[in-house]
Amino acid sequence: MSKSNSKDTKVKAIAVFCGKIKGTVIFTQNKEGIVEIELNLSGLKKNHSHGFHIHEYGDMSDSCESMCAHFNPYGKSHGGPNDSQRHIGDLGNIETDGNGNAKYIFKDSSIKLTGTKCNIIGRGLVIHADTDDLGRGNDPTSKITGNAGKRIACAVIGYARP
């Protein structure tokens, strides 16, 4: 990553999914610290919502399982991306079209590509089989995982070429 003194410099990161589920997720942090998340994914279940989270580690030694829990540096309960009570890694759900593709952009003000506490570089990005209930379920697991189900695809988030 090249460094610049310009306040207009944007920091970019990428996660590349290979396998049955393919594509990229590009993260771009602007000078205000807001991160734009651009999805370009295929091979997902058609017309479905898949739980989508940043996990603690970018460790793929045991596929997606070694990425451990959701990234949660403040020790909060699971929630939705717009909730004040949420893991930093709680990005909500990926919405797919009739072909199983997800191609759109959304923003998040909690994750960061710089600094230390909320920095997601080197962490795991996981797509789950089921819909994330955003911590609103009636069982204890809802406040931990959102009942998003099995991990069906994962990638490591790394700095992107400028």
Indicate where each model-derived feature is located.
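N-terminal leader/targeting pre-sequences
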Residues: 1-162
